[in-house]
Amino acid sequence: MDLGLRGRKAIVCAASKGLGRACAEALAAEGVDLVLNARTATPLQQAAAEIAAAHGVRAVAVAGDIGDAAVREALIAACPAPDILVNNAGGPSPGRLKSFTADDWTRALDGNLRAPAAMLAAVLEGMAARGFGRVVNITSSVVRHPIDVQGLSAAARAGLHGLVSTLVREHVGRNVTINNILPGPFATDRLISNFTFQAKQKGISPEEALAARKAELPAKRFGDPSEVGRLCAYLCSAHAGYISGQSILIDGGAHPQIL
């Protein structure tokens, strides 16, 4: 299926690896030119070069912490009229409520609520004026199915979902959609970090913790980041203009539900 995206322009955050990189790859495969962001310059520049070479698109790297207003301004300067925004950020470190410091809360909210909110504020008006816009927020399944050591992530990301719910109706009539993807367990560095923390608590090795979790999953495997990438690309497509305000769980059936 041609997604009708060739020649469009996208900003993709946290794009040097993992789910962000997968979203960038999937969009580039559809002919979308990219402006990519991540904290560390070298891997980001390498990702941009590899994506551009593989797909024949323009891919520009803007390194820095998306929580920094100057970095957000640089992203918009590099892509002043984006058609697509993929908000994505590394999640906060796992822990228990009593262990969270004021700095922990600030970092969690800056990266997973304030920064994506600021990016939304920067792009939505222009998208609406041009008559096309697609925003995809990569959040987490913990918004719907909390994990006891993911309190910071659940709190910050749930806040973003709440904000999105107030914006959808205002913009969908001008062909601007905003959706959330809620990944479950995917084979990323983030997964390994989380299970290393849990393994330490349980007195087992990270490998044992990962194997036990995989055995519990209905799919008997962790998700591949490309599966999130392809879902993201479809939500950004010309065919998805009637899908907005949705929070789509992609977790291999790990969390049973009726609605």
Which residues does each predicted region cover?
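Short, small/polar-rich loop/turn modules that mediate ligand/substrate recognition or access, typified
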Residues: 172, 177, 243-245
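Conserved glycine-rich cofactor-binding loop
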Residues: 14-17
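Catalytic loop of short-chain dehydrogenase/reductase
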Residues: 136-159, 164-173, 185-186
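Conserved glycine-rich Rossmann-like NAD(P)H-binding loop of the short-chain dehydrogenase/reductase
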Residues: 32-46
